[in-house]
Design a protein with these regions (language model features):
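Non-catalytic signal-transmission and effector/linker regions of two-component phosphorelay proteins
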Residues: 1-14
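Acidic catalytic/metal-coordinating carboxylates
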Residues: 41-45, 68-71
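Active-site beta3 strand of CheY-like receiver
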Residues: 53-59
Length: 119
């Protein structure tokens, strides 16, 4: 299970999801815990933003139009080795979780995400 409690209190979290309402909700939740949050609505947008400003953690949707969350994770690891990535999905299956874990993602969460799963 992922936990943000190991991050320093003012850590920067990069949130990536193609669902605008989820981006807004998760951003508010994370900011209320003291984290700095940046967002992107696509994996490609996230990579562009990460090139400008690094994050302490990336929290990304698995299934997005264009590049998916696992491909984003692989690109992040090739450019910023060791940056932790948590993959989240509304349609999580055991094979998805196994693939994500074998790829080396920090954690895999199924939406809706319970506040206790993160903090």
């Amino acid at each position: 299970m992922a936990s943000l409690s190991t991050l320093h209190p003012d850590a920067k979290i990069f949130l990536v999801d193609d669902d605008a309402s989820l981006l807004k909700l998760m951003s508010m939740r994370l900011r209320s815990q003291g984290y700095e949050v940046d967002t992107a609505d696509s994996a490609e947008g996230a990579l562009d933003r990460l090139r400008q400003q690094r994050a302490d953690l990336v929290l990304s949707d698995l299934r997005m139009g264009g590049m998916d969350g696992l491909a984003l994770f692989e690109r992040i690891q090739s450019q910023w080795l060791g940056m932790p990535v948590i993959i989240m999905t509304a349609h999580g299956t055991i094979p998805d979780a196994i693939q994500a874990t074998r790829s080396g993602v920090f954690s895999f969460l199924t939406k809706p995400i319970n506040k206790d799963e993160l903090f």
